[in-house]
C-alpha cells in the first residue's frame, strides 16, 4: 500500500550458545549487527538500533500504544508527491477536528476495518485523534491507540474527509460507526501519505 514508518520495531531470537545457557551467555554486538543489517537492506529501509530485551518481549503484542500520522496537502507540490495526499477540493478542517474528537467516544471500530480479516476483536482504545496545520496548505492527522485494525487509519481519514467536504454530517458518522458496517463509512484514502511514527511498550 506504500505506507511509511519512521519507527518500526521487530524482534528476533538470538541463538543459544553450544552449552545451552541462553542468549545472555552469547555476546551480542548491537553496533556491529546494526551496521551489517544496513549493509544488506535496500536503500529505503534502515535499522536505527538493535537492543537486547527479555524473552517475553514481542514487537507486536507487547506494544501498549501506537501513533500514526496522515498527511494531506491542498495545493500542488511536487516535493510532497509520494509522501502526502493531494486533495483538490476545499476541506473544513475545523469540522474534521470536531468529528475526530467523536472517535474518542467509541471503542468498536468494525466500520473502519478491512472486511474478511481474521481478528478476534475490533475493539481499540483511541487516546488521540486530531488535525493540525503544519503550514499553509499542509495538514497532518495524528491518531493514537493501543492497537489498530487493518486499514483502520486510512478508513478513518477517508470518513473525516467526507465530513470535511460536507458530504457526511457528524451525526451520520456516528450512525456509520454504530452500524458496525464497513459500507457505511468513507472510502479508504491512499496509503502513501500514512506513517507509523511511534510505538510504546
Specify the residue positions occupied by each region the protein language model found.
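Structured-RNA-binding interfaces characteristic of tRNA pseudouridine synthases
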Residues: 1-201
Amino acid at each position: 500500500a506504500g505506507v511509511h514508518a519512521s519507527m518500526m520495531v521487530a524482534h528476533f531470537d538470538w541463538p543459544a550458545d553450544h552449552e545451552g545457557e541462553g542468549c545472555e551467555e552469547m555476546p551480542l554486538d548491537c553496533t556491529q549487527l546494526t551496521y551489517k543489517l544496513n549493509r544488506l537492506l535496500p536503500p529505503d529501509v534502515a535499522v536505527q538500533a538493535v537492543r537486547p530485551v527479555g524473552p517475553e518481549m514481542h514487537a507486536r503484542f507487547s506494544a501498549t500504544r501506537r501513533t500514526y500520522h496522515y498527511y494531506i496537502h491542498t495545493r500542488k507540490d511536487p516535493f510532497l508527491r509520494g509522501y502526502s495526499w493531494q486533495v483538490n477540493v476545499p476541506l473544513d478542517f475545523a469540522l474534521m477536528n470536531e468529528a475526530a474528537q467523536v472517535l474518542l467516544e467509541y471503542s468498536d471500530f468494525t466500520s473502519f476495518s478491512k472486511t474478511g480479516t481474521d481478528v478476534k476483536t475490533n475493539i481499540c482504545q483511541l487516546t488521540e485523534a486530531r488535525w493540525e496545520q503544519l503550514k499553509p496548505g499542509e495538514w497532518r492527522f495524528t491518531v493514537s491507540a493501543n492497537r489498530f485494525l487493518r486499514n483502520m487509519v486510512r478508513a478513518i481519514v477517508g470518513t473525516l474527509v467526507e465530513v470535511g467536504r460536507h458530504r457526511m454530517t457528524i451525526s451520520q458518522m456516528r450512525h456509520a460507526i454504530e452500524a458496525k458496517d464497513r459500507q457505511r463509512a468513507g472510502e479508504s484514502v491512499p496509503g502513501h501519505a500514512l506513517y507509523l511514527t511511534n510505538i510504546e511498550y
